[in-house]
Amino acid sequence: MRETDDRCRLVLIPPPTEDIEKQAQQLEEALGAGDVATVILPQYGRDDQQFQIAAEHIVPIAQAHGAAALIAGDSRTAGRSKADGLHFEGSIEDLRDTLAKHTPKMIVGAGGASERHKALEIGEAQPDYIFFGKIEGDIKPEPHPKNLALAEWWASMVEIPCIVMGGNEVASVVAAAETGAEFVALRLAVFEHPEGPAAAIATANALLDEKAPRFNA
């Protein structure tokens, strides 16, 4: 078992961009600098053709570095780009349908867990993970307190892994890890880091190595 398997790990979310080739290069740098479990690529405002092009750039890079590549958007794009799975946000009924259609062949995780009741409804559907926060929710240096509270509550009682959205500073991974969450998602903290994505990932992993609780302690 790798040392990182026993503590909170990183999830990367590339921000919206018109220069997908530059972002692909940034992702390559980031993933080459340290452990990342998963890359989630959102559709944002792209049309299906633009999103397909983005996925064809991002998915192979993630997979080449051992990270799962998930598509947040059109499931057809996930299939055509040979992504590992889907990040789903929508109704409980649609989540159940998506899980029935795509699992166990693909990873299917779920967002939209804005409060405890909704989180438990999502959990009953048995996704592969639950996501606390909004994909574009890294508007402050630190994670949103509500998301930290939800993650701590969830991690203490439910076996389904959770991802908590971090802040726009790398140091926010510590607060996220302290909740007991299995994963912390970073977006702007990595892709807009003043020293570059590689420095951000190296720093984040160093902080998690030093300060994240161990699951089997």
What is the role of each PLM region?
Residues 1-87, 92, 101-108, 113-128, ...:
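Conserved N-terminal beta1-alpha1 strand-loop-helix module at the mouth
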Residues 31, 142, 164:
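Active-site-adjacent loop and "lid" segments of alpha/beta metabolic enzymes
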Residues 131, 162-168, 185:
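Glycine-rich anion-binding loop/nest that anchors nucleotide
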Residues 112, 144-147, 166:
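Short capping loops/turns at secondary-structure boundaries
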Residues 93-96, 134-157:
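Flexible, gly/pro- and Lys/Arg-enriched active-site loops
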Residues 16, 136-139, 188:
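Short, well-ordered turn and helix-capping elements at secondary-structure junctions
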